[in-house]
């Protein structure tokens, strides 16, 4: 619609990250070629949800759980190669125990940009404070390990999802940005310290994050957490990294 020119200077979907199942292997090439023919100036990458929870607890928040063992599928790597050969990026939605598998993928395809979604999704659902702390330590270890690969970026957000164990989704009172910032700060700061602002981008993950908070307090919380950052760091977090990774030629607002 935006490309039709009927809506003036509208730049809706200036860049698109589509879906494809990499388990199709080499057959994925034809699908990607058709997608690129349809949106040659807009298709930037592919995203696949690959979250796995052996306990099954997380799936009560996921109406249609993704298949298990996606990255272990015998055709997955060849499917990824089709994506890589076309210069597309890959958005990986996984829980933190799976980050090592994504790291192996980054090592195998060093010229392809991989974007870790939702800050690496620390899976701490239904845990008490001690349990969440143990998960935080393991998540931090995994995030720091994958950050060593220069072709990996981190999308900071998704913190309103229930998987983190904050239990904001159980609340009935409005949650303000300061309370969100206090809970989220260790995760946001860890991600930025691991990747650097130049490889991090802020995301709203809305409406899924609406389980926990409103759109305005969400963004205010993220901005509040990094309020002491330099102007260059803020520009990277809220504009430059996303513009570079997804090749979006839009001026800063």
Question: What does each of the following model-derived ranges do?
Answer:
Residues 1-98, 104-107, 120, 133-135, ...:
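Active-site gating/metal-coordination segments in enzymes
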Residues 16, 46, 83, 118, ...:
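Conserved, mostly hydrophobic/aromatic
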Residues 31, 79, 98-101, 142, ...:
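Alpha-helical packing segments of well-folded alpha/beta enzyme cores
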Residues 41-51, 113-119, 152-157, 201:
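Non-cysteine beta-strand/loop elements that form the S-adenosyl-L-methionine
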Residues 41-42, 84-89, 108-115, 148-152, ...:
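Glycine-enriched alpha-helix->loop->beta-strand junction motifs that scaffold or abut catalytic
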Residues 102-103, 125-129, 162-172, 208-222, ...:
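Histidine/acidic-residue-rich catalytic or RNA/ligand-binding cores of hydrolases
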Residues 135-167:
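Aromatic-lined glycan-binding groove of carbohydrate-active enzymes
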Residues 186-190, 194-201, 208-253:
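Mid-to-C-terminal alpha-helical segments outside catalytic/metal-binding sites
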């Amino acid at each position: 619609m935006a490309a039709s020119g009927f809506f003036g200077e509208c730049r809706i979907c200036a860049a698109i990250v589509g879906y494809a199942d990499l388990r199709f292997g080499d057959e994925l090439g034809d699908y990607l070629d058709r997608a690129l023919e349809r949106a040659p100036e807009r298709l930037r990458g592919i995203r696949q949800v690959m979250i796995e929870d052996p306990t099954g607890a997380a799936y009560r928040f996921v109406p249609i759980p993704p298949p298990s063992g996606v990255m272990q599928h015998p055709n997955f790597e060849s499917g990824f190669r089709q994506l890589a050969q076309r210069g597309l990026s890959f958005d990986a939605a996984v829980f933190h125990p799976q980050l090592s598998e994504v790291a192996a993928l980054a090592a195998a395809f060093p010229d392809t940009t991989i974007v870790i979604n939702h800050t690496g999704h620390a899976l701490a659902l239904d845990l008490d404070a001690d349990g969440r702390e143990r998960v935080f330590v393991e998540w931090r270890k995994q995030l720091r390990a994958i950050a060593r690969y220069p072709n990996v970026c981190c999308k900071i957000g998704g913190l309103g999802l229930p998987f983190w164990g904050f239990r904001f989704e159980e609340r009935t009172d409005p949650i303000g940005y300061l309370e969100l910032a206090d809970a989220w700060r260790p995760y946001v700061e860890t991600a930025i310290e691991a990747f650097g602002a130049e490889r991090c981008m802020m995301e709203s993950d809305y409406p899924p994050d609406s389980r926990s908070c409103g759109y305005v307090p969400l963004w205010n919380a993220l901005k509040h957490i990094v309020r002491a950052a330099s102007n260059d760091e803020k520009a990277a977090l809220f504009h430059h990294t996303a513009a570079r990774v997804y090749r979006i030629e839009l001026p800063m607002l």
